[in-house]
Amino acid sequence: LDREHAVPRRDALYMLGLSYYQTKVYSKAAETLGKVTTENDALTQNAYLHMGLSYLQLAEKNKARMAFEQAAASNANMQIKEQAAYNYALCLHETSFSAFGESVTAFEKFLNEFPTSPYAEKVSSYLVEVYMNTRSYDAALKSIDRIAKPSAQILEAKQKILFQLGTQSFANADFEQALKYLNQSIAIGQYNRQTKADAYYWCGESYYRLNRMVEAARDFNAYLQLTTQPNNEMYALANYNLGYIAFHRKDYTQASNYFQKYIQLELSLIHISEPTRLRRI
C-alpha cells in the first residue's frame, strides 16, 4: 500500500489483476487491471492487453476491442503492441457491421507494421476471406495495393481479384478494360495456374471481339497449354474459337482439325447449351 494515501500501488494492483486472470477470475481481473491504467507506460499497456483478454473470456467483445485498441496505441513494448494490434483487428472483424470496413484497415495496418509477425499468416487469411466473400473487388484491389509487403496468399487473392474484374468488364462489353485486368492477372499468375489459364481464355475472347485475331489465337493456345482442366466446356470452346479464327484466315485444313477436336470434346461432355455452341454462326 501507498502509506501516505492508503491506496494500493499500481504494481501491486497489476500483479493482483494478473493473478485473477491466471486463475480465470476474469471479471475481477478486468476490474482490477482497469485501476492500473492511470499512467502512459508499459504497465498500463500490459494491463490493457490483459483486460482485453479477460473481456474476450467474458464474451464482451466490444469492451475487449476498446482495451486492445488502447494497448496497441502504446509503443512502450512492441511485443505487447503486436499482440494487442492483432487482437484488436480480430475483434473488429468479428464485431463489424460492415462486411468491408474498419477490420480491413486494421488488418492492413497490422501487416505493414508487423510484416514478419507470427500472426501475419492468419491476418492474411482473414483479409483474403473478406476480399473473396464480399466481392468488393475494386475495394479489395486498393486494399492490397496499400500493403507494403503482401504475402503469397494475398498476391494469389490479387491474381484472382484481377481476373474477376476482367470477367466483369467482359460481361459489360468493355473488352479493352477486360484485357487490362486480365493481363495484370496473368502477369502475377505464378500463384494459381488455373486462374492464369482462365485469364488467357478470356483474353482470347476479348481479342476476338475486338477483331484482333492474331492475339486471340495466341491466348487461346496459351490457355490450352496451361489449363489443368482439359475436359470442360471452356477447353472445347477454345478449340471451337481457334477453328473459326483459322476459317477466317482461309486456313481450312487447320480449321477442320480444330472443329473435329471440338466435336470430339463436345461428345465427351455431359452438356453444352445450344446457344453457346452456335453463338458465332
List each language-model region with its residue ranges:
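Short solvent-exposed coil/turn linkers within tandem alpha-helical repeat scaffolds
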Residues: 1-10, 35-45, 71-81, 97, ...
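TPR-repeat structural position
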Residues: 26, 61, 98-100, 137, ...
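Single conserved hydrophobic/aromatic residue that forms the stacking wall/gate
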Residues: 270-281
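Structural motif corresponding to the intra-repeat A-B loop/turn of tetratricopeptide repeats
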Residues: 23, 58, 95-97, 134, ...
